[in-house]
Amino acid sequence: MAQVLAVPGDRRHGFDFKRSFSHDFGRITGIAVSNENNVLLCDYIKNQLLLFDEEGNYLNYLPLTSSPWDVAISNQNTAFVTMPTEQCILQVDPDKLCICSKTVFEHPNTFISCVSSEMSTTEPGNIYVGFVSGGRSMAAQIMEGVLIIK
């Protein structure tokens, strides 16, 4: 069973998931668990998101136009997926595997590297994106689906 490790009111930073999969993976670069306890994996080599239930049973996949690198899921059950080769972030419904929106960074020297979540059981969680732009490493926050760069 996928299980988020948290004490009520504490931030959630990880989970314990011990399962064996009988699936032909490329290269898994990101993992997150939805509010429905489904496991979402980024397969960088095969350009897809994979969905498994909490027992490790394959449910579905979403083919993508390029390689997904990382994923984080907000308290509102929205998955944010970074796709560095397209310089974009996808918002995905993690349980239905459908793309809700796509944010593209137009600056030619921008590299989207990672996404992470800071979740709380008592307040809305924050999603952060790490990226390099113009030679500078930066972080941006996503609040209610809007990317905020300070």
Region spans (language model):
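A short helix->beta-strand "capping" segment at the edge of beta-propeller domains
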Residues: 1-27, 53-57
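Conserved beta-strand position repeated once per blade in WD40 beta-propeller domains
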Residues: 30, 70, 112-114
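Residue-level detector of Asp-centered blade-edge/turn motifs that repeat once per structural unit
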Residues: 33-36, 73-77, 116-124
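Conserved beta-propeller blade signature
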Residues: 38-40, 78-81, 126-130
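Structural motif
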Residues: 47-50, 86-91, 135-146
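Blade-loop segments of beta-propeller domains
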Residues: 53-89, 98
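Asp-box/WD-like beta-propeller blade repeats and closely related beta-sheet repeat scaffolds
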Residues: 88-126, 131
